[in-house]
Amino acid sequence: MKTANLKSATIAALLGLGVLTGCTNSTTNQKTSDNMETLNLTQEWDKKFPQSDKVNHRKVTFRNRYGIMLAADLYEPKSAEGKLAAIAVSGPFGAVKEQTSGLYAQTMAERGFLTLAFDPSYTGESGGEPRNTASPDINTEDFNAAVDFLTAQPHVDAERIGIIGICGFGGMGLNAAAMDTRIKATVASTMYDMSRVNANGYFDAENSADARKQKREAMNTVRTRDAQNGTTTPGTPGLPAEIKGDEPQFVKDYFDYYKTDRGFHARSVNSNGAWSPTMALSFINMPLLSYIHEIDNAVLLIHGENAHSRYFSEDAFKRLKGDNKELLIVPGANHTDLYDRMIPFNKLEKFFKSNLK
């Protein structure tokens, strides 16, 4: 195993640990069966990055094994010939495919891969009720379902499929790679371990049975009240409406991405909504990274030098086994720099071309 360095600068965290969506204009209804919900998919280019003239793009849908229909953007290089290596992309936690994951996907398509950026279950344009919730099991399955979809595409070589998980979906991606042997290469970029941060708090500051009990009691009180009253308690937004100046730096960095024109999107939970107040319950009791030491295929962890979340990747890297595992630290970068400003695409291209061949 090896640790590499790169160059870059600015920002720091995630808002999706039980703390931290939408609208469309022109839409198309898509339905896969009479038993499935209809998705209203916008057909306009409403993404936070310009459309590439080197890539063909189209909206697609597919179901996971829980019957939830997922919405995705498929990117294919216009110069494509024959069957291609493919990459499924998702995250950050609380973001939509029109934000970071779409930027990763389109750029990797420009570099020769067929790519798929999808909205996780219960968020964005994907289906699932109630809205704005998450699950370590179902969101891991979302990655596995994306692999299902890619294996069935005529221009994809089913033996050359990788994934990119960003932020909270970095941990989900590692969990998917630990169970899905079809995934030949995995990147976790600016990763959060959502189980650990929900159970233990930031930097494990709440890592005690008493602290976890208090969290469980608070969330189960909400469940009881909702059951008795037939209501659904709304969540509290993870980001403030405005920055006052005394917030932790990582909150300022999140705000700079999700709440400004740089990254704001109306369908993003982190930009324009709030997570279910009971969302963290399952994460507390279901450790995502339990079996990552059994991943045989290649893994690349990428994190910013100045990211508050860097310890998630460093600790995960210590548990990975084999010479095909790598940790890349991007100098000067914080957590959200890897959302858009300092993504090491040359390294990503080299990694996937080396391991999807």
Question: Which residue stretches match the model-derived regions?
Answer:
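Catalytic histidine-centered segment of alpha/beta-hydrolase-like enzymes
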Residues: 333-342
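Short beta-strand/loop motif that positions the catalytic acidic residue
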Residues: 295, 301-303
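N-terminal cap/lid segment of alpha/beta-hydrolase-fold proteins
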Residues: 37-82
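Alpha/beta-hydrolase-fold enzymes
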Residues: 175-257
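Conserved alpha/beta-hydrolase
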Residues: 107-127
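The serine-hydrolase catalytic nucleophile loop
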Residues: 94-106, 120
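Short beta-strand element of the alpha/beta-hydrolase
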Residues: 83-92
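Alpha/beta-hydrolase active-site loop
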Residues: 133-154
